[in-house]
Amino acid sequence: MNENTKVIKGRTGDWEMVLGLEVHAQVASKSKLFSGAAVGFGAGPNEQVSLVDAAMPGMLPVLNRFCVEQAVKTGLGLRAQINLKSRFDRKNYFYPDLPQGYQISQFDQPIVGEGVVSVERDDGTTFDVRIERLHLEQDAGKSLHDQDPNATYVDLNRAGTALMEIVSKPDMRTSEEAAAYVKKLRTILVYLGTCDGDMEKGNLRADVNVSVCRPGDYEKFRATGDFKHLGTRCEIKNVNSYRYIQQAIEYEARRQIEILEDGGKVDQETRLFDPTKGETRSMRSKEEAHDYRYFPDPDLLPLVLDPAWVKSIEETLPELPDAKKARLQSQYGLSAYDAGVLIIDADRADYFEAAAKGRDAKLVANWVTNELLAKLSAAGTEFTNSPLPHTDIAQLVELIENGTISSKIAKEVFEHMWAGEGRPAEIVEKRGLVQINDTGAIEKAIDDLIAGNPDKAEAVKDKPQALGWFVGQVMKATGGKANPGTVNELLRKKLGVE
């Protein structure tokens, strides 16, 4: 058993969970997978529907080349095998928001094969999640049940939108690992520009496969590849937040354990997560591939990719999160933690690098990942919309470096910057916050303090830790403007503290 595997205590012994995810990522494209209809969030019902999307008679699908390029780019970003020949199939099922009566997907010949995603846990350790495949498919429309008590309305704006379904192997063993995997996958997709990763809008959602087994059984499965060593899995559909992913997994694992410990049998089924109640509920029995009667779509030729075209896409890939993190650590001397915080968002990392030019990079990272990030998070905004340009953070750090202000005063200056009072240097001048570096002025404050506290001055020789009180009093006397390093140095000299 891996030391990171979570053991769940049951009445009849220990259990472990086994998790695999199918992540549906909406392709960042201006038009749909097989039609020229626009893709956008917030349009009125059925405003972005073509005759192809509505499955009108005689309308034929035409493959969107850009969506194929986005899928290839994603596959390369996942270190996956790009299949030069793939095929589109019809997945047959009936639902009101699927006007064709089938979904165009990819069954046994997907565009992308096996890959891998390296994921970091909260404690800094890493694990790999193997990618089984990535395939392109159409999204369905949306059924609206709350518009009329006697009817269901259908909005086909989403119908035909391109999705990438990214299927993982069952390599995750805790709910925290599953959430961390989705976070990392989202970061990669956003870096690549192939999906905007907005989970609130449904552009990234996960189907979570959960099963439980006894300790040691998972290792047997990994050694043999035989699923008989694992329990029956249930799929939780369309979970669209990291927190809900964790909650759904924890509840479902407990539910399955209770059934098994009561002597029952877990049914393979599709379930939904109810975030209000924090529980999963049955949706339908889980279908197998043969239930969908897959067959090649006769309206679409096999998809054959030119190796040179794939190579040209690979050459345009941006620097991805893992490579960027390693570079930030080596180039700027950042800690793994700070680099990890910065690379969560490419714009965040770019902001840091722009601010760090010619400055103390570690100090810049500290301001970006702490004060600025906290303010942006509280305001619910991102670095792209930061009211403080990177030049302001760079100037603030410069004022600290050249001794114009102390780190303590810098925090006060930062608050005024955030309030929109101007650039750092202007605020320092306007508010008279320049640090006192004049040793004469500092010595006078120290002499006055010692003269007024002779007993404490004598006692500090035996209790050097009491020096902090003197430092605090001098800083207070100078309005926090005295250079802390100079204060410390002069106090030690005058009080005879080594």
From Swiss-Prot:
Chemical reaction(s) catalysed: L-glutamyl-tRNA(Gln) + L-glutamine + ATP + H2O = L-glutaminyl-tRNA(Gln) + L-glutamate + ADP + phosphate + H(+); L-aspartyl-tRNA(Asn) + L-glutamine + ATP + H2O = L-asparaginyl-tRNA(Asn) + L-glutamate + ADP + phosphate + 2 H(+)
Keyword Repressor listed: no
Keywords assigned: ATP-binding, Ligase, Nucleotide-binding, Protein biosynthesis
Subunit structure: Heterotrimer of A, B and C subunits.
Native organism: Caulobacter vibrioides (strain ATCC 19089 / CIP 103742 / CB 15)
UniProt-listed NCBIfam families: gatB, PRK05477.1-2, PRK05477.1-4, PRK05477.1-5
InterPro entries given in the database record: Asn/Gln-tRNA_amidoTrfase_suB/E (IPR017959), Asn/Gln-tRNA_Trfase_suB/E_cat (IPR006075), Asn/Gln_amidotransferase (IPR018027), Asn/Gln_tRNA_amidoTrase-B-like (IPR003789), GatB (IPR004413), GatB_C_1 (IPR042114), GatB_Yqey_C_2 (IPR023168), Gln-tRNA_amidoTrfase_suB_CS (IPR017958)
GO terms assigned for molecular function: asparaginyl-tRNA synthase (glutamine-hydrolyzing) activity; ATP binding; glutaminyl-tRNA synthase (glutamine-hydrolyzing) activity
Record function comment: Allows the formation of correctly charged Asn-tRNA(Asn) or Gln-tRNA(Gln) through the transamidation of misacylated Asp-tRNA(Asn) or Glu-tRNA(Gln) in organisms which lack either or both of asparaginyl-tRNA or glutaminyl-tRNA synthetases. The reaction takes place in the presence of glutamine and ATP through an activated phospho-Asp-tRNA(Asn) or phospho-Glu-tRNA(Gln).
Domain of life: Bacteria
One of the protein's GO biological processes: glutaminyl-tRNAGln biosynthesis via transamidation
UniProt-listed Gene3D superfamilies: 1.10.10.410, GatB domain, N-terminal subdomain
Keyword Protein biosynthesis part of the UniProt annotation: yes
Listed name of the protein: Aspartyl/glutamyl-tRNA(Asn/Gln) amidotransferase subunit B
Protein family according to the UniProt entry: Belongs to the GatB/GatE family. GatB subfamily.
Enzyme category, top tier: ligase
HAMAP family: GatB
Database matches in SUPFAM superfamilies: GatB/YqeY motif (SSF89095), Glutamine synthetase/guanido kinase (SSF55931)
EC number: 6.3.5.-
